[in-house]
Structures are given as structure tokens and as C-alpha cells.
A protein has these predicted regions:
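Hydrophobic N-terminal alpha-helices or hydrophobic patches in metabolic proteins across all domains
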Residues: 1-497
Length: 497
């Protein structure tokens, strides 16, 4: 484990950095001491077990190390951190044997709560929270006008932002509920039922919390629950709900199972000589060392000319008179960004390109920190989002799947006189066009492993107006001009080789 800590220190430190800066994962600081305490509780049983290395576990360790390599090259924190945690877990049976690992199954599994993962559910939980809040308001006689995650009631405007999603409550409840179930129940059925309850309760509680916050503000004339205090009310409510859940769960507490005597083959009297334990530890260390060595070789920077990106003149699409970037998409860590406004049939179409090179954890095109507009944007609101199938004859007979967004400007209870934008987006990664971030990451990783570099980009197209005219305009532009833009990006990539 010491070797894993030294070889993968960057990944472990990055994990701790997330615990420090993100309140969502602050609970992870408690995981290592809890695991040590759980192991200490079992010290009497562990003392009866003989260490018997299991060399075959080196194979899953190699798979986990390769998973870390892929996650590190792709800049995916969750994959790299899950892989390192798996290495820590697998090191126990590899060096100390399966009997020890079986007895430590829960403490070792609990280590995975160190990994700061789960924020991918934020979007869908925000939608669920908004759906329930609006439904509950209407059910209690409060009229609501809704636009995406924003809604307006007679007393004011409200929005569901990331902090309202309930992900923080869910992850904390899941961790504490899992520990509670292990310590208080011996039946697997009761344990799994309580873990399921610890997932369901915070989701529903967060919906009720959001509704109560809005109603507090509404009934108090926006004097209560409209500032920082509504977060305080939320945590108090959550604490009460979780406390009640544990009190009820304790009513079905079961006595702890009696310690099991080890099998004769696992008993201390049959201990494996230290001369066999140390070679197993050395082989495990060598296995886990291969992935960091490969990562260093693949990521060693090469001298390349500076990146210059200007969007080209396109045939049949002259420049528009006004070159104003009306909607600047948010892309962190891009090597360069460029935009150009083209005059099209019926109106102008703006093209924005965020170009990435030498991608890493904080500088990747598919980062969750990259978005079209933030959820609390004051200038634009998302009316709809989905996938559009856009015919691009030069790229094949199958329509190209693109991300589709309909945006509206301002925040009032009327759509009259408000600006609309019709937006289409697509990734260019590994020489392919892809609308799904996971596949874009995969194509980029394959290109990197094949020695073609990791250049990638997000192409954003938008035009003024409402469906269906604006949608036809922007999609017609994409169908005609996307091949030329892709060819230009290929030239930019080739110029740096």
C-alpha cells in the first residue's frame, strides 16, 4: 500500500483536494479514520488468520492499473481515483491472502466512499426537484410559470441551482446509512433494505425541502428563506429527517454476529513464511508501477509550434456585418477559442470553436466544468434541450446527431419581445464527430494511444429566432459548412505534428 501511495500520489492528492474545496465531498475526510477504526474492531479475529498471498490477484491489479492509465490519459478523475482505490483494496488479498480480505470485506469496500463521485446526477436531480416543486406549488393553489429550471410565482422568481439538487444530502446519507446498516444489522436483507432507504429518503426529503423553502418565501412576502438562511433551513430539515430515519432504523437493530473461528487452513498455525510474503509484495509493487511509467512516457511533452486558430472563410457564407459573440459558451482550459459570424439565408449564424490540446484533468473538452450556460445565468434561460439529427450529405447518408438547445433571453413571465437562440453543438475528437461526451472522450483516448495526439474541439452553432425557422436555418448551415470546418480543424492539428 505504501508503494501505491508513492506511485499514485498525484491521484490521491487530487482526491483530497476535491474533499477540501467541495462541500459535497467533505464527508470523505472521515472515511480513512472510519476504515482504520473498523479494522481495529476486528483485530482479535485478524490475529487468528495466517497471511497467505494470492498471486492470481495480481491479474485484477494489473487491470485496475490499466484502468488508472486510461483514466489518467483521458483526464477523468473518477476513473483514475476509482482505479487507485481498487488497487488499495486488491493489495490486501494479493499480499495477505483471501481469508484476511474476506474478513475485511466491508472496511475495504467502505474505502470507495473516498472517491468523490456522484455529481453526474446533479442535472437529473435538479430536474426532479424542479418538477416536484412546481407540482406541489400548483397542487397547493400557487400559480406557476416555468421555463426549464426557472419558475415564477406571484411573489417572485425562483430557480433550481446546483446547491438545490440534493446531491450533497444523497451522498452523505448513502455513506452514513451504509455504515449504520453494517454496524446495526447482521442480516444481509436488512442491511440492503436500510441502504436503499438511505438513498430514497434524502431524494424525497430534498424535494419537500425545496417546496418548503419556496413556500416560506412566498408566505412571508420574501422576507424568509430568500438568502443564505434558506440553506440553513435546508440543512436543519435534512438533519431532522435523517435523525428520524436512524431512530426508526435502530428499532430493528440485531445483535452482532458471534466471531467465526477461522478454517483450519487459514489458522495462524499454518502461517505462510515471510519469505513468501515479501516476494508477493514486491510483485504487487512492480505490477502497480507499470501504469505510472507508461503514463509518463505517453504524456511526456513534445515541442510543438504555437497553436493558432482562426475560422476560415466559407463558400456561400460571407461574413456578417456584425461580428458580436452574443452567446459566449463557457469552456475552461481551452488551448484557444475562436468565433466568426456568417451571413446565412434568412439570418446570421455564429460559429464558436473551443480547441483543446495536451488535455488533462483541468483542461479537457468534455469536462463537467464546460457548459453552454450556467444554471443561474442572468442573460439566458434554457427552454429545451435534446438531440437533433442533422443531414450532412458530405459526411455520409446517416444524419449527424448533435446537441440541440433552445434559449430565451431575460427572465419574465412572458415570451413576447424576448430574444431566442437556436443552438447546435458537436464534439470533434479523435477525428470523429460525436454529441455524447463519453464517446468523445473514448475516441480522443484511442487517438492518443494510436499516436495521433489528443487534439479535440467543441463546435457550437447558433442563430436568432424561434423554432422551426431558426432550427432549419442553423441546421442547413451545418449541413453545408460543417465538412469545411472539420477539414480546417484537421489542418490545424496536422500543422502541429
Amino acid at each position: 500500500m505504501l508503494a501505491i501511495g508513492l506511485l499514485y500520489d498525484d491521484t490521491l492528492l487530487a482526491m483530497a483536494a476535491i474533499w477540501r474545496r467541495s462541500e459535497t465531498f467533505a464527508h470523505a475526510w472521515l472515511v480513512p479514520p472510519i476504515v482504520l477504526w473498523l479494522v481495529w474492531r476486528l483485530r482479535g479475529e485478524l490475529a487468528l488468520l495466517a497471511p497467505r498471498p494470492a498471486p492470481w490477484v495480481l491479474l485484477p491489479m494489473a487491470v485496475a492499473a490499466f484502468g488508472w492509465l486510461l483514466g489518467d490519459l483521458a483526464g477523468i478523475n473518477a476513473v483514475a481515483q476509482l482505479a487507485v482505490t481498487a488497487l488499495l483494496v486488491l493489495a490486501v488479498p494479493a499480499v495477505l491472502g483471501l481469508a484476511v480480505a474476506r474478513r475485511l470485506m466491508f472496511p475495504l469496500g467502505f474505502l470507495f466512499f473516498m472517491v468523490p463521485i456522484g455529481e453526474f446526477t446533479t442535472g437529473v436531480m435538479m430536474e426532479w426537484t424542479a418538477d416536484f416543486t412546481v407540482w406541489a406549488l400548483v397542487a397547493t393553489g400557487v400559480p406557476v410559470y416555468r421555463e426549464g429550471l426557472q419558475f415564477i410565482i406571484p411573489s417572485g422568481a425562483w430557480s433550481v441551482v446546483e446547491a438545490c439538487s440534493g446531491v450533497r444530502y444523497l451522498i452523505a446519507s448513502f455513506m452514513v446509512g451504509t455504515l449504520f446498516a453494517y454496524l446495526n444489522y447482521s442480516s444481509p436483507v436488512r442491511r440492503w433494505v436500510f441502504v436503499g432507504i438511505s438513498i430514497l429518503v434524502p431524494i424525497v426529503a430534498n424535494w419537500v425541502r425545496a417546496y418548503m423553502i419556496v413556500m416560506l418565501g412566498h408566505l412571508s412576502g420574501n422576507k424568509l428563506a430568500v438568502g443564505v438562511d434558506h440553506l440553513v433551513y435546508g440543512w436543519v430539515f435534512f438533519g431532522i429527517v435523517i435523525g428520524i430515519m436512524f431512530v426508526i432504523g435502530a428499532r430493528w437493530q440485531e445483535p452482532a454476529a458471534a466471531p467465526r473461528a477461522p478454517a483450519a487452513a487459514d489458522a495462524v498455525g499454518t502461517a505462510t513464511p515471510a519469505a513468501r510474503v515479501w516476494p508477493a509484495a514486491a510483485l504487487a509493487a512492480i505490477t502497480v508501477a507499470l501504469a505510472p511509467a507508461a503514463a509518463w512516457a505517453l504524456q511526456h511533452p513534445m515541442d510543438r509550434p504555437p497553436l493558432v486558430l482562426t475560422l476560415p472563410t466559407l463558400p456561400g457564407a460571407p461574413d456578417a456585418a456584425a461580428q458580436v459573440l452574443k452567446l459566449p459558451p463557457h469552456f475552461e482550459g481551452a488551448a484557444t477559442q475562436a468565433h466568426r459570424v456568417y451571413a446565412g439565408e434568412g439570418g446570421a449564424v455564429t460559429v464558436h470553436v473551443a480547441y483543446y490540446r495536451h488535455q488533462g484533468y483541468g483542461t479537457k473538452v468534455t469536462s463537467s466544468m464546460n457548459f453552454l450556460i450556467p444554471s443561474d445565468d442572468r442573460h439566458w434561460n434554457r427552454l429545451a434541450a435534446g438531440v437533433a439529427r442533422v443531414p450532412v450529405p458530405a459526411l455520409g447518408s446517416q444524419p449527424l446527431a448533435m446537441r440541440a438547445h433552445e434559449l430565451i433571453g431575460g427572465r419574465t413571465a412572458s415570451t413576447v419581445g424576448r430574444e431566442h437562440l437556436e443552438v447546435r453543438q458537436v464534439y470533434w475528437a479523435g477525428g470523429r464527430l460525436e454529441h455524447r461526451s463519453t464517446w468523445a472522450t473514448a475516441w480522443g483516448l484511442l487517438g492518443r494511444l494510436a499516436g495521433r495526439g489528443d487534439d479535440a474541439a467543441m463546435l457550437t452553432f447558433y442563430t436568432d429566432g424561434q423554432n422551426p425557422e431558426a432550427a432549419r436555418r442553423v441546421e442547413a448551415f451545418v449541413g453545408q459548412q460543417l465538412p469545411a470546418l472539420v477539414a480546417h480543424l484537421e489542418q490545424v492539428r496536422a500543422a502541429a505534428r
